[in-house]
């Protein structure tokens, strides 16, 4: 596994970001925050999908006043996204928000920033500094001519210093850009410049398909260097899709111990079963499991089990039947019409065993 960059730990609600902790998956609601019922419903869907921290826009007082009601009805940390008006940050903090996303430089005069910092410090709430290539300060753009990684790091350090001068150190930083190469360079330089946890993202990445590819390319490159402590996949799509993509990305790098993985072959002329529909059905079935089970769905009974030795459980199709196997060893043959149900039963058994083992380990710690 890639060696992770060391950062200081920062508490966000009941989670700790940074330090030696796993990467945390975030998303953002698409509802009007003042519509508490709709916002809570969307957050619960995100929770079910595996979202661990959720951010809401707080553009006005109605949204800020809704924070307390939303907090009462959800189970994951809530982040307030604030721009310009420091009073909205104060109201969000008063309502029990778990983290505030601001840029200290656009909040206003020092006394306004100090008011937010003091309120956050009193409640033990961290602040995320959100640097974005598309909204860098004028003096930085004048200095560099256009958005650059060095300019983004300079902006981050400027905002960090504002908070540090007020003796505030519960800081998380993001360095977002829609240009993949720029984002990669900015995060690399940020990781060398300071040890605060980094929230990863490729902003304005696009629609479900294009945005998934773009985010995977950019964030994959960053993750491969051991950089990052939280991430959001930004898509013009249902935010649940953001969480699904994030989970798959982390699994690809061995960075998610709480998610199931599907192994399936690309199909060929030897296949005797409807492998594509079976693989999709099984993928949906395991999508909400919170254990690191590996499941294989393969179309060839000759090579299938051997090609998926690392799978905890799997099925390999043949004409009229399937081979059920564990760790590459055939367990039994099952009729084609029942093989998916038999596979699901085995998945349930193994997932329960893994969950019990994890609970036992927790109790022994």
Swiss-Prot record:
Cofactor(s) this protein requires: [4Fe-4S] cluster
GO molecular function: 4 iron, 4 sulfur cluster binding; 4-hydroxy-3-methylbut-2-en-1-yl diphosphate synthase activity (ferredoxin); 4-hydroxy-3-methylbut-2-enyl-diphosphate synthase activity (flavodoxin); iron ion binding
Free-text cofactor note: Binds 1 [4Fe-4S] cluster.
Role according to the record: Converts 2C-methyl-D-erythritol 2,4-cyclodiphosphate (ME-2,4cPP) into 1-hydroxy-2-methyl-2-(E)-butenyl 4-diphosphate.
The protein's name in its UniProt record: 4-hydroxy-3-methylbut-2-en-1-yl diphosphate synthase (flavodoxin)
One Pfam short name: GcpE
Pathway: Isoprenoid biosynthesis; isopentenyl diphosphate biosynthesis via DXP pathway; isopentenyl diphosphate from 1-deoxy-D-xylulose 5-phosphate: step 5/6
Positions with a binding annotation for [4Fe-4S] cluster: 265, 268, 300, 307
Organism name: Bacillus mycoides (strain KBAB4)
Superkingdom, taxonomy of origin: Bacteria
UniProt KW keywords: 4Fe-4S, Iron, Iron-sulfur, Isoprene biosynthesis, Metal-binding, Oxidoreductase
E.C. designation(s): 1.17.7.3
SUPFAM superfamilies named among the record's database cross-references: Dihydropteroate synthetase-like, Nitrite and sulphite reductase 4Fe-4S domain-like
A GO biological-process term: isopentenyl diphosphate biosynthetic process, methylerythritol 4-phosphate pathway
Catalytic activity as recorded in UniProt: (2E)-4-hydroxy-3-methylbut-2-enyl diphosphate + oxidized [flavodoxin] + H2O + 2 H(+) = 2-C-methyl-D-erythritol 2,4-cyclic diphosphate + reduced [flavodoxin]
Family per similarity comment: Belongs to the IspG family.
């Amino acid at each position: 596994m890639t060696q992770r960059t060391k950062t200081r730990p920062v508490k966000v609600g009941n989670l700790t970001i940074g330090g030696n902790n796993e990467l945390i998956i975030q998303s953002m609601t698409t509802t009007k925050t003042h519509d508490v019922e709709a916002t809570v419903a969307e957050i619960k869907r995100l929770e079910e999908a595996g979202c661990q921290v959720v951010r809401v826009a707080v553009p006005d007082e109605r949204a800020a006043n809704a924070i307390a009601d939303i907090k009462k009805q959800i189970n994951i940390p809530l982040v307030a996204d604030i721009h310009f008006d420091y009073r909205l940050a104060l109201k969000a903090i008063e309502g029990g928000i778990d983290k505030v996303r601001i840029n200290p430089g656009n909040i206003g005069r020092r006394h306004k920033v100090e008011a937010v910092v003091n309120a956050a410090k009193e409640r033990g709430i961290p602040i995320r500094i959100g640097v974005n290539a598309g909204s860098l300060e004028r003096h930085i753009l004048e200095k560099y001519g256009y958005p650059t990684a060095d300019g983004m790091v300079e902006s981050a350090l400027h905002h960090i210093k504002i908070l540090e001068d007020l003796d505030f150190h519960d800081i998380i930083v993001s360095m977002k850009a829609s240009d993949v190469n720029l984002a990669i360079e900015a995060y690399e330089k940020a990781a060398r410049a300071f040890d605060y946890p980094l929230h990863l993202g490729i902003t304005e990445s696009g629609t479900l398909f294009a945005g998934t590819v773009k985010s995977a390319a950019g964030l994959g490159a960053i993750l491969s260097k051991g950089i990052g402590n939280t991430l959001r996949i930004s898509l013009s799509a249902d935010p649940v899709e953001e969480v699904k993509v994030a989970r798959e990305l982390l699994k690809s790098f061995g960075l998610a111990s709480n998610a199931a993985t599907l192994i399936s072959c690309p199909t060929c002329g030897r296949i005797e079963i409807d492998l594509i529909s079976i693989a999709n059905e099984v993928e949906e079935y395991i999508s909400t499991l919170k254990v690191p089970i590996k499941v294989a769905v393969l179309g060839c009974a000759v090579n299938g089990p051997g090609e998926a030795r690392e799978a905890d459980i799997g099925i390999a199709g043949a004409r009229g039947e399937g081979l059920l196997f564990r760790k590459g060893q055939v367990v039994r043959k099952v009729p084609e019409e029942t093989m998916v149900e038999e596979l699901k039963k085995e998945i349930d058994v193994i997932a329960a065993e893994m969950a019990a083992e994890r609970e036992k380990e927790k109790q022994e710690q």
